[in-house]
């Protein structure tokens, strides 16, 4: 009997598919049943070969070897996951296997993961496609009843290959050229470089900003505060100090006369459902999660707990075919604290509308919403609960009536000058009943008040007149949340660019994709092009210099717009990938010529007096997310060591987080308040604390892990939190 291989992207999804398809026989990297063999990748198992794969001469980075443009680009098995590739291949080539179901993530990258494996295995069997947005049993069963023809996704695959090859051709060549030309570890790319340029522009805007003072006037009357309004501009502030100071004197002792009351019934609708970027923004704003951390937690909610739909979506809408499933999803989350809201929605009846259901605004995947899986909050970690709560409340909110209120605008005159106040009377909480936080987006200077009973013609005595003043503020520095927003909508950083390119970036979702933006930000941190101070992101000297060295069009989002426009054309079958790749090769050659002819120099302004123990050259001091490091300036040497690490250990004096400095016996905790404490003293102090759950072994284990130079934004910090070291 012939069988079908089902290729998943990850083991966890593979196990779910195998369970539904009744594949219980365990093999080496696969599960087998009567009809199906389920196997899985581990993300990418196959990738494009590095330059040294085309010849030993490319093992050394030399400017004279550039550009490197192999014909054709070769695929290689990733060494780290080579065993799993062989396990997958052995199933694909079986004689009893008649066809293959691609069950990797439903999107451009998922298509590439599977197709590259199949191509490298030299298998040409018929392909079918599983295209689902959640991995619940019901979704899997429905998906297998409606498998799509693999040929329908050929263009999507060609688009994915074109993107990967273009990134290789431009990225590899530009990075090697910059690094060898300026003898510094420099990298660039079509997404990371314009992202860095946006951070630099924001820094420049802040630096050049000149604050302008402004002035206002407030009148305190019985039961409310009135705000002066300029009759000419209708503004509640002026940049002329003499205007308000003269008014404050002239209006003293004069009453306020109510000249008009305007009452307006208003409705406020719930914010849209979450796509990945919006969820990352909110999670950073409310919980301080990094973009990568949010995606990691979300992936667990999707794969492990099966409580939410596909995470890497760029849509904030649902398609019409999802509407009949909304009732089941609501019933799955009928536990506290959501049960009362679910009951109210079900009693009223589930009503969909165009504000969140629109087929035209759903491409590969709909918005992130709960699945019908029964909710067990006790099985979730604290972070998983927080993230699920955001998704659940947003889902409930769009299914609830609008928030309704009556807005009252008061117009009064004092000595012929106009003063205003406004108040709000809630008629129906609607969707706001789901939330227990106040509006955070109300930035208006004139706040809503609880107004007394008033009538037109009323005369009120003015108890006091107060002059107010402030200054215009510079643009805020980026944090990870606002940087994600800028990457999604970079139009403000494309002044002077063609309108069609700005429009394209808007249509294609900006710089990068929902799935790659977190990694791009992380790479900028890891390569020390940007750094964090608190939550704010700053460009480093290295980042500023890099932008001076790269060709100008690599800094503009317009390059990404042009590429995405063409990649979209390839995916739709309107453009041949070969024409696009030919253009990218010419672009790479031009970029190399520009870099080679540059007369600029790169200056290490973070050089120290410490010599590298491996090569003897002076080392550079760099600030990472987890602390301070010394890195050898010789890129080929690559020696690095951590000299100060940020920890979660709290200072016994001010309770702020302490930094760990030094090595071995001499390691010392240091705090910004001036407190110093040797590691040995720290251990003794904690050992005395009978209530602490941190044993000496716990502390030593933590310190051992701290010494590893791991990528930033890892989970190490979480370990110390659990040890209760802030007692």
From Swiss-Prot:
This enzyme's EC code(s): 5.6.2.1
Gene Ontology cellular component list: cytoplasmic replication fork
Region (Disordered): 685-713
InterPro entries membership: Topo_IA, Topo_IA_2, Topo_IA_AS, Topo_IA_cen, Topo_IA_cen_sub1, Topo_IA_cen_sub2, Topo_IA_cen_sub3, Topo_IA_core_domain
Keyword rRNA-binding in annotation: no
Function of the protein: Releases the supercoiling and torsional tension of DNA, which is introduced during the DNA replication and transcription, by transiently cleaving and rejoining one strand of the DNA duplex. Introduces a single-strand break via transesterification at a target site in duplex DNA. The scissile phosphodiester is attacked by the catalytic tyrosine of the enzyme, resulting in the formation of a DNA-(5'-phosphotyrosyl)-enzyme intermediate and the expulsion of a 3'-OH DNA strand. The free DNA strand then undergoes passage around the unbroken strand, thus removing DNA supercoils.
Active site: 310
Cofactor (UniProt): Mg(2+)
Interaction with DNA, as annotated region: 187-192
Molecular-function GO term, any one: magnesium ion binding
Major enzyme class: isomerase
Site feature: Interaction with DNA: 61, 168, 176, 312
Catalytic activity: ATP-independent breakage of single-stranded DNA, followed by passage and rejoining
UniProt family annotation: Belongs to the type IA topoisomerase family.
Topo IA-type catalytic domain sequence ranges: 153-592
Coiled coil: none
Biased composition (Basic and acidic residues): 685-711
Toprim domain sequence ranges: 3-136
GO BP of this protein: DNA recombination; DNA repair; DNA topological change
Swiss-Prot/TrEMBL keywords: DNA-binding, Isomerase, Magnesium, Metal-binding, Topoisomerase
Residues given in the record as Mg(2+) binding sites: 9, 105
Keyword DNA-binding belongs to the record: yes
Protein name: DNA topoisomerase 3
């Amino acid at each position: 009997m012939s069988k079908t291989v089902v290729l998943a992207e990850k083991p966890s999804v593979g196990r779910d598919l195998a369970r539904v398809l009744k594949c219980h026989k365990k093999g080496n990297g696969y599960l087998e049943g009567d009809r199906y063999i389920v196997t899985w990748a581990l993300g990418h198992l196959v990738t494009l070969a590095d330059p040294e794969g085309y010849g030993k001469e490319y093992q050394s980075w030399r400017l004279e070897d550039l550009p490197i443009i192999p014909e054709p680009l070769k695929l290689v098995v990733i060494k780290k996951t080579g065993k799993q590739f062989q396990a997958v291949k052995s199933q694909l080539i079986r004689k009893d296997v008649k066809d293959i179901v691609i069950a990797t993530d439903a999107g451009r990258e998922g298509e590439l993961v599977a197709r590259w494996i199949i191509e490298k295995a030299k298998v040409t069997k018929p392909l079918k496609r599983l295209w689902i947005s959640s991995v619940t049993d019901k979704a899997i069963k429905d998906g297998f009843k409606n498998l799509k023809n693999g040929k329908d996704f050929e263009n999507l695959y060609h688009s994915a290959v074109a993107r990967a090859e273009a990134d290789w051709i431009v990225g590899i060549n530009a990075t090697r050229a910059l690094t060898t030309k300026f003898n510094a570890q420099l990298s660039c790319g079509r997404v990371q470089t314009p992202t860095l340029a946006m951070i630099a522009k924001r820094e420049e805007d802040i630096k050049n900003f000149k604050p302008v003072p402004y002035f206002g006037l407030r009148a305190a009357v019985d039961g409310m505060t009135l705000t002066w309004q300029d009759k000419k501009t209708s503004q509640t502030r002026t940049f002329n100090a003499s205007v308000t100071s003269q008014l404050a004197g002239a209006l003293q002792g004069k009453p306020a006369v109510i000249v008009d009351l305007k009452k307006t019934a208003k409705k406020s609708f719930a914010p849209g459902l979450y796509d990945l970027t919006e969820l990352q923004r909110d999670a950073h704003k409310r919980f301080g999660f990094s973009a990568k951390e949010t995606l990691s937690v979300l992936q667990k909610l999707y794969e492990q707990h099966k409580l939410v739909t596909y995470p890497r979506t760029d849509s904030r809408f649902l398609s019409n075919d999802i509407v009949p499933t909304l009732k089941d999803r609501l019933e799955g989350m009928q536990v506290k604290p959501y049960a009362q809201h679910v009951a109210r929605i079900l009693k009223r009846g589930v009503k969909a509308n165009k504000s969140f259901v629109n087929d035209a605004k759903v491409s590969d995947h709909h918005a992130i919403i709960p699945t019908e899986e029964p909710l067990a909050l006790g099985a979730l970690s604290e972070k998983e609960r927080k993230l699920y709560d955001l998704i659940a409340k947003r889902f409930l909110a769009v299914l609830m009536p609008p928030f309704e209120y009556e807005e009252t605008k008061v117009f009064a005159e004092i000595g012929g000058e106009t003063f205003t106040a406004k108040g709000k009377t809630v008629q129906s909480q609607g969707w706001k009943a789901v939330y227990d936080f106040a509006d955070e987006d109300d930035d208006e200077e004139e706040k809503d008040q609880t107004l007394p009973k008033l009538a037109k013609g009323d005369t009120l005595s003015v108890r006091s007149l107060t002059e107010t003043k402030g200054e215009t503020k510079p643009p805020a520095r980026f944090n990870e949340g606002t940087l994600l927003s800028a990457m999604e909508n970079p139009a403000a950083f494309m002044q002077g660019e063609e309108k069609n390119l700005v429009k394209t970036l808007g249509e294609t979702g900006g710089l990068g994709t929902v799935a790659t933006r977190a990694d791009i930000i992380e790479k900028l941190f890891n390569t020390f092009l940007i750094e964090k101070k608190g939550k704010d992101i700053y460009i480093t000297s290295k980042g500023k210099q890099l932008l001076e060295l790269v060709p100008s069009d690599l800094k503009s989002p317009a390059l990404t717009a042009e590429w995405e426009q063409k990649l979209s054309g390839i995916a739709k079958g309107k453009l041949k990938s070969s024409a696009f790749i030919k253009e990218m090769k010419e672009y790479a050659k031009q970029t190399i010529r520009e870099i080679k002819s540059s007369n600029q120099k790169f200056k290490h302004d973070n050089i120290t007096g410490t010599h590298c123990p491996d090569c003897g050259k002076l080392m550079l001091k760099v600030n990472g997310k987890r602390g301070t490091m010394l890195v050898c300036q010789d890129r080929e040497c690559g020696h690095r060591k951590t000299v100060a690490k940020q920890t979660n250990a709290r200072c016994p004096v001010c309770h702020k987080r302490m930094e760990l400095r030094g090595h071995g016996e001499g390691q010392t905790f240091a705090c910004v308040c001036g407190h110093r404490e040797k590691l040995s003293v720290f251990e003794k102090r904690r050992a005395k604390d009978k209530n602490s759950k941190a044993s000496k072994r716990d502390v030593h284990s933590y310190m051992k892990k701290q010494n590893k130079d791991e990528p930033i934004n890892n989970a190490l910090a979480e370990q110390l939190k659990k040890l209760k070291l802030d007692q």
